[in-house]
Amino acid sequence: AEGVVSQGVAAIMGADCSGVTGAIATNVAVPNGVVMISPSATSPGLTTLDDKGFFFRTAPSDARGGQILADFTKDRKVKSVAITYTNNDYGKGLADVYEAAVKAHGIKVTTVAAHEDGKADYSSEVATLASAGGDAVAVIGYLDQGGKGIIQASLDSGAFDRFILSDGMIGQ
């Protein structure tokens, strides 16, 4: 990003994830007065970024997304939920909002646990989630970077058969 800014670019389109977006906005775009627009960075932390009017996004903040996911959980009559999230800005931010929102709906949160992306096997993570219990497991992450593995390990072990999935779990 520094390279294109030094070449006089008028604006930056990106980045695609919240952590990278926050770093580029804070360290490159805003200090250099360059407009930055992210189509997919959703972390609630970006809402309070001291952007001096230079940072925008076209996807809604997870501050709203977490509430919608909690409403969906309530509508599905889930009474207790285990939450696992990808261990990054997106996952942590959405998990925090979701946890508060489901609790506000009177839904018991049995556990909240981070998971690392890209592992070959998630059976130990699922065992930890299952030991806490829950009518369902909320998987806040990415389909191709751990989410699918958590679902598969849950089904294979019989730990969970109901899933609440975040927007990052959409894939082909």
Task: Label every PLM stretch briefly.
Residues 2, 9-113, 162-172:
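Extracytoplasmic ligand/sensor domains, especially the bilobed periplasmic-binding protein
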Residues 3, 24, 124, 128:
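Active-site pre-lysine segment of PLP-dependent enzymes
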Residues 4-11, 131-136:
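Short acidic/histidine-rich motifs immediately flanking catalytic phosphotransfer sites
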Residues 4-5, 70, 129, 158:
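Generic helix-packing signal
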